[in-house]
A protein has these predicted regions:
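Helix-terminus/linker motif at the lipid-water interface of multi-pass membrane proteins
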Residues: 62-81, 150-157, 213-224, 283, ...
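Short alpha-helical transmembrane segments in multi-pass integral membrane proteins
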Residues: 2-50, 108-175, 221-280, 336-402, ...
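N-terminal transmembrane alpha-helices
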Residues: 37-75, 88-107, 132-139, 174, ...
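Hydrophobic/aromatic residues within transmembrane alpha-helices of membrane transport systems
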Residues: 55, 67-71, 83, 108-113, ...
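Small-residue-rich hydrophobic transmembrane alpha-helices
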Residues: 80-140, 177-196, 310-374, 406-428
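Transmembrane helical elements of multi-pass membrane transporters/channels
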Residues: 48-67, 169, 180, 236-240, ...
Length: 514
C-alpha cells in the first residue's frame, strides 16, 4: 500500500533496537535508559513514566485540599468561596501560557526521540526567554485588575475582600509558578518525570508548613489570614524553582544552558513561530476551559453562598477523580512525542490504547468509593453541620461520572497533540464547553434550577469524547508536524486508525497514569 505524504515510506522496524533501521541519529551523550520512551514494552514504560506524574498531581491536590481545610474550617464559608473564585482566575492565568510550555515540551520530546540534543537545547533556550517574558507581562497586567475581574464573576460580597487579597498576592507568585511548571514539563519531555516530582514534593512540603504559620500568625510571624495562604504559595514556588535550577547546574544536566552558552537564550524565530502557531491553540484550550469554569462559577454564585460553598467542596473532591486521566494523558503525550520523533508510529498508536484502557480502570476505581463515601469526604471541606453538605453530595452524584468520558478525551488528544495537530482539539473542546455545557446550563436553569448546571458536566463530557474518538479515527493528525524538516518520515497508511477500545482491547494493569 502506498505511503501518504511527500517523503519515503518508513524504514523497516528493527525489533531488537526498538527503532527504525536506517534512521540518522544526531550524536548525544549517553542517556539513562529510564528516560528513553522509544524502547521497551509500552505498558511498563508508560507506568514507570506516569507514576511520578500521578504522584505529583496527588501532592498538588492534597496541598490544595489541606489549604481548603484550613481556610474552610477556620476562616469560614465566605473564605472558602473566595478561594474557589480566585482559583478559577489562577487557572485562567496558567492556561494563558500553558500552550507555550506544552509546545516547547513536545519539541523537546521529539528532538530527544531523534537523539538530537542540539535542537532540544535550542528549543529550551528560546522558549525559556519567550515564556518568562509572557508570564511577567501577564502577572503585571493582572495585579491592578484583580478586583474588577472578581466583581465581573459575581463573587459574593461577603467573599470579595478575601478573594481580592488572596488573588493580588497570587499574581506576584505567577512568574515563579510558571517557570517551575515550564522546567518540570521540559524535563518530562526529555523522559524524566522523577526529578520534577521530587522538587514538587519540596514545593508542597514548604507550602503545607507555611500556610498555617502565615494564616494564623504562629510564633513571630504576622497573622495574614487568607493572604497568608497566597504568600506561602509564593515562597514555596520561588524556593523550589531556585533549588531546581541549582540542581540542574550542579548535575551538569544535558539540557542545562551555562553562562558560556547564553547565546541559546536569544530567540530563534523559527522556534518562536512554532511556539506561537502551536502553543496558542493549546493555550486557548486551557483558556476555554478556564473561561467555562468562570462562567459556571458565575452561574453558581447566583444561587447563594451555600450552593457556592458546596460547589467549591465538590471541586476539591473532583480534583482527585480527574488525576488518573490527567496523569495518563500527560504521560501519553510525552511518550507519543518521543516516538513520533523516532518514527515509531506503531508505538504511538499502542500508547493511545494503553492510555485509554488505564483511564477506565483507574478513574472508575476512584469514582465508586467517592460516591459511596462522599458524605465523609465532602464533610472535610465544610464546617461541621454545614447545610452545604447535602447540596455538595447531590452535585457529586450527578457529575462525578463525567470524568470517565473526560479521561478518554484527555488521553486521545494528548497523543494527537504530540504530532503537532493542535487546532482540532481546540475546536472539539470549544464545541463541548461553549456549544453544550454553558448553553445547556443557561437554557435549562429556568426548568431544572441549579441541577441544570450539574447535568451540563456529563452532557458536555460525553459530546467531547465522541468527537475526540471520531477525530482520532478519521482525522489527519498523523500528518501534522511541529517543525517541518526534510528528513521527516511519511505516515504509512497501514498505521491503525481505530480509536482505542477499552472493551475489546483491555490494557494490562501495568500502565497506570495520572
Amino acid at each position: 500500500m502506498m505511503a501518504r505524504g511527500p517523503s519515503a515510506i518508513l524504514p523497516p522496524f528493527d525489533p531488537r533496537r526498538g527503532r527504525a533501521r536506517g534512521r540518522t541519529e544526531t550524536a548525544m551523550p549517553p542517556r539513562d535508559r529510564r528516560h528513553d520512551l522509544t524502547e521497551g514494552s509500552i505498558g511498563p514504560t508508560l507506568f514507570a513514566f506516569a507514576l511520578p506524574i500521578l504522584g505529583g498531581n496527588v501532592l498538588q491536590s492534597l496541598n490544595g485540599s489541606i489549604n481548603a481545610v484550613w481556610i474552610g474550617r477556620f476562616l469560614g464559608e465566605s473564605a472558602l468561596t473566595a478561594v474557589a473564585n480566585a482559583n478559577n482566575i489562577l487557572f485562567f492565568l496558567l492556561g494563558a501560557v500553558f500552550g507555550i510550555g506544552m509546545a516547547a515540551t513536545i519539541l523537546v520530546a521529539q528532538a530527544m526521540g531523534r537523539h538530537d540534543l542540539a535542537e532540544a537545547r535550542r528549543v529550551i533556550g528560546t522558549s525559556a526567554t519567550f515564556f518568562t517574558a509572557v508570564s511577567v507581562l501577564i502577572a503585571a497586567a493582572g495585579l491592578p485588575l484583580s478586583r474588577q475581574v472578581l466583581q465581573w464573576m459575581g463573587t459574593p460580597a461577603a467573599a470579595l475582600p478575601y478573594a481580592d487579597a488572596y488573588l493580588r498576592t497570587i499574581f506576584l507568585a505567577v512568574p515563579f509558578l510558571y517557570l517551575f511548571a515550564f522546567l518540570s514539563a521540559t524535563l518530562r519531555g526529555a523522559g524524566d518525570a522523577r526529578t520534577p516530582f521530587l522538587f514538587l514534593l519540596l514545593v508542597v512540603a514548604l507550602d503545607v508548613v507555611l500556610v498555617p504559620l502565615l494564616v494564623f500568625g504562629i510564633g513571630p510571624l504576622p497573622e495574614l489570614g487568607m493572604t497568608g495562604a497566597a504568600v506561602a504559595t509564593l515562597l514555596a514556588n520561588a524556593s523550589s524553582l531556585a533549588a531546581l535550577l541549582l540542581w540542574l547546574r550542579h548535575r551538569r544536566h544535558p539540557l542545562w544552558i551555562s553562562r558560556a552558552e547564553r547565546a541559546l537564550f536569544r530567540p530563534d524565530w523559527a522556534i518562536v513561530r512554532t511556539l506561537v502557531l502551536k502553543g496558542v491553540p493549546m493555550g486557548a484550550q486551557m483558556v476555554l476551559i478556564s473561561l467555562a469554569m468562570i462562567a459556571m462559577m458565575a452561574m453558581v454564585n447566583r444561587h447563594g453562598t451555600e450552593t457556592t460553598a458546596a460547589y467549591g467542596a465538590v471541586m476539591q473532591l473532583w480534583t482527585y477523580v480527574q488525576m488518573p486521566a490527567m496523569a495518563i494523558g500527560a504521560a501519553c503525550s510525552s511518550m507519543a512525542a518521543q516516538n513520533v520523533g523516532a518514527g515509531l508510529w506503531p508505538r504511538v498508536d499502542a500508547t493511545a490504547r494503553a492510555g485509554v484502557g488505564f483511564n477506565f480502570l483507574l478513574t472508575g476505581a476512584l469514582i465508586v468509593p467517592l460516591i459511596l463515601f462522599d458524605r465523609w469526604t465532602l464533610a472535610v471541606f465544610l464546617p461541621e453541620g454545614s447545610p452545604s453538605l447535602e447540596v455538595a453530595r447531590h452535585i457529586n452524584h450527578i457529575g462525578v461520572g463525567s470524568f470517565l468520558f473526560f479521561g478518554v478525551t484527555f488521553v486521545l488528544f494528548g497523543v494527537v497533540r504530540a504530532t503537532g495537530a493542535v487546532v482540532p482539539p481546540l475546536v472539539v473542546l470549544g464545541l463541548a464547553l461553549w456549544g453544550v455545557r454553558v448553553p445547556f446550563a443557561n437554557a435549562l436553569q429556568p426548568t431544572l434550577g441549579a441541577d441544570a448546571i450539574w447535568w451540563s458536566f456529563p452532557a458536555s463530557a460525553l459530546v467531547a469524547m465522541l468527537l475526540a474518538m471520531a477525530y482520532y479515527r478519521w482525522g489527519g493528525w498523523r500528518r501534522a508536524r511541529m517543525l517541518p524538516r526534510e528528513e521527516d518520515l511519511a505516515i504509512p497508511s497501514e498505521v491503525p486508525a481505530q480509536p482505542p477500545s477499552p472493551v475489546a482491547e483491555p490494557c494490562p494493569p501495568r500502565a497506570r497514569s495520572l
